[in-house]
Amino acid sequence: MRADLITIQQTLTPEAATVLNQSIAEATRRNHGHTTPLHVAATLLSSSSGYLRQACIKSHPNSSHPLQCRALELCFSVALERLPTTSTTTTTTSSSSSSSPSQTQEPLLSNALTAALKRAQAHQRRGCPEQQQQPLLAVKVELEQLIISILDDPSVSRVMREASFSSPAVKSAIEQSLIGNSVSNSRQTGSPGIINPSAIGFGYRSVPAPVNRNLYLNPRLQQPGVGMQSGMMIQRTDEAKRVIEIMIRTRKRNPVLVGDSEPHILVKEILEKIENGEFSDGALRNFQVIRLEKELVSQLATRLGEISGLVETRIGGGGVVLDLGDLKWLVEHPAANGGAVVEMRKLLERYKGRLCFIGTATCETYLRCQVYYPSMENDWDLQAIPIAAKSSLPAIFPRLGSNNNNNAMLLSNNIISIESISPTRSFQIPMSKMSCCSRCLQSYENDVAKVEKDLTGDNRSVLPQWLQNAKANDDGDKKLTKDQQIVELQKKWNDLCLRLHPNQSVSERIAPSTLSMMKINTRSDITPPGSPVGTDLVLGRPNRGLSSPEKKTREARFGKLGDSFDIDLFKKLLKGLAKSVWWQHDAASSVAAAITECKHGNGKSKGDIWLMFTGPDRAGKSKMASALSDLVSGSQPITISLGSSSRMDDGLNIRGKTALDRFAEAVRRNPFAVIVLEDIDEADILLRNNVKIAIERGRICDSYGREVSLGNVIIILTANSSLGSAKNVASIDETRLESLVNKGWELRLSVCNSSKTRKRKPNWLYSDNDQTKQRKEICFDLNEAAEFDSSSDVTVEHDQEDNGNLVHKLVGLVDDAILFRPVDFDSIKSKTAESLKKRFSNGLADGLTVEIEDDALERIAGAIWLSKISLEEWLEEAMGSSLNSVKSRVSSSEDSVIRIELEDDLNDRISGGYLPSSIRTVVV
């Protein structure tokens, strides 16, 4: 082992060998079995030269307090204490031949330290071309290379992170110092051995070295005064050569130089070479250059014909290189330039092989181009070329005096950690405009403040930074995460406000266009979102005759889902739901979109789907759930009432099971069922909390503590709370309407002369003339006892407010919330009358008139609204025989009127449904 150590020491300079020997002595003192890079780093940090210490201070971005290095020493000391120790073994020489005392065995060099020494030697040879031909032992590793190799060791980097230092930043500081040393030495006008220590950034060691001696710069480029300029010129020449090589390829031959500072300079040099004919023997022979003026670029969408003609006149027998300039014009007006991208692709296809594009862009611009025009890179055959920012050394290390003075260059104190450099640090996710009411806007601002507080660390420790636990230097990632969270918050509160307070700002949010399945596939002029994270998922479908808040619908959603959206499934669901609940077409569209999105993984990661039906249309919500269950699972939904009126599952209550138990049992029996939890706003607090936990965890726990996975069930929560300010639509007494249509009633067709017709206009269903709250008659009977269960109006108002807050919270947890508009019963009656008249007009002569009695129309429309059967199905079933009877009794020449009326004698129906199964025909 001693022989190997001597061999290794021969490859080190005296200073580096001294550090290694001191490290071995430290390992021996601590009774360690191996000498590791941690020992070397600790020795370097405590050495008298202080080279590593000064580099650490210079590399720290916030402060240069000496106690920071003291904290680093403590961290290395703790790390050394954690290393395993070995029992001291002594080796004694032969007592007969030698009288030397026993000595402690020196620790071996660890594999990590051996690898670091080999790295240092390899870097030393690579950095000095004059040493590459020398024997291996002749290459002397200097202290700087030893430090850099030690900093590359993972154990050393980990300890430095614990002390809030960055190994890459320290390495960068050392390397920049080496470059500064070389340039300062090359500028000295005298003996090369006389060097002013003040001209060096830090850690200068008086080691004689030739002027051209440097570890990272080619000695031929280190001529006095021109070293760095020559290096930059050669680097730029290499980049230009790379661009030319791309332009002469057959594929991906249109370069886009991506950089933040100097790509346009490189483009200018390349285009000048092409114009001067410097590529006369290559693929760019006889190529001409067309530079688009800034005004022409800004109007590219409207002046494509002019550009096409210009290319055609200049292309001749060679080709044309079209300079597109800075591509920021593509992202400034993305909607207007969508057609320009397509036309430029056609131009490339027309002159394939003879037309090249070249342009520049910043990192932010190029990323936005990829977001706005996903296919542009393939359509334009683009090849992105990253261009590193180049600055002259005097700009990085400002000189304090002229060349004749002793003051040269000093290292900048702001040395940025390599880990903190991100290619997307200047890219910001565009924020969408908030279009919610003042209440939701205040909630949004509170959430944003919480996010900023968490990310900026307002609750940071009072300890100085050098005594805090190290954190990864991920400022760029934090910024991107913050932007993503803000976009999600914007989407959340815009969406919530749209559903909960629809009329607050509906005029600002209603989209003018209608949803069309053809437009989903063919429309290309929709403005793309500013970011794939910032897409607003607002549900609904605009309807020509409705002013629902869901009119701000689906185009943003379809743009986000893209190819993953199954149009066939959406169309199937929409057709089935809209057929069953045709008066809630917006809600049907929202339900179909939500189910399709969640089925394709764009919702939550769990298999269960949670929807919330809000609004006053109880019958519409029930029919929507039934239609959805029939389309998805082919069966009827399992309905569990959580409110006081348990109408549909009274039989289950007898068995002593709570609603939570019935919910868990339904999931256990069929993990693919559709389960309706009615009146969630009337449930008790325990059940509400269990539902919220089930939404978050994907598992439901019954009253016995047994957990059941929700599997792939679809859970629909219904709430009757009035959300937001509803439209001024006449309210319907659902209970009274149901009791009326549930009584026995029959219809008859009366065929009579037009002069005998009569009209009745009852208005039992509405109270349009009394829009204000009716005054209650107060009548006190002092002989009656007071009712203890009566509640005041104040209590009722608080209960309604609590229910509204509950719904507001649940909307943020479920996958989607669908608002059911108040039922416009006039439109239901109008469509019912239209369908009835159309059915009669198709079967009878044109001269006959069909009239419908108001009472009959109201009962038919109410029964259609409440029953499971559709209007078309009932007409086909009940009207067939009646039409045949009317045809046989009425002549087309007679001036007759066919009236649909209620029977005077109301008897119980045999069918048991809301609608009569047959219609009697009477000729008056």
UniProtKB/Swiss-Prot annotation:
One of its GO terms (biological process) is circadian rhythm. It comes from Arabidopsis thaliana. Probable component of a transcriptional corepressor complex that acts specifically in the karrikin pathway. Controls seedling growth redundantly with SMAX1, but is not involved in leaf morphology, shoot branching or germination control. InterPro entries: ATPase_AAA_core, Clp_N_dom_sf, Clp_R_dom, P-loop_NTPase, SL_signaling_regulator. Residues 109-181 are annotated as: Repeat 2. Residues 86-107, 522-552 are annotated as: Disordered. Disruption phenotype: No visible phenotype under continuous red light. Smax1 and smxl2 double mutants have substantial reduction in hypocotyl elongation. Residues 86-105 have a biased composition (Low complexity). Interacts probably with TPL/TPR in an EAR-motif dependent manner. This is Protein SMAX1-LIKE 2. GO terms for molecular function: ATP binding; ATP hydrolysis activity. Belongs to the ClpA/ClpB family. Induction: Up-regulated by karrikins and strigolactone treatments. Expressed in seedlings and leaves. Detected in roots and axillary branches. Residues 12-83 are annotated as: Repeat 1. A motif (EAR) lies at residues 780-784. Gene3D superfamilies: Clp, N-terminal domain (1.10.1780.10), P-loop containing nucleotide triphosphate hydrolases (3.40.50.300).
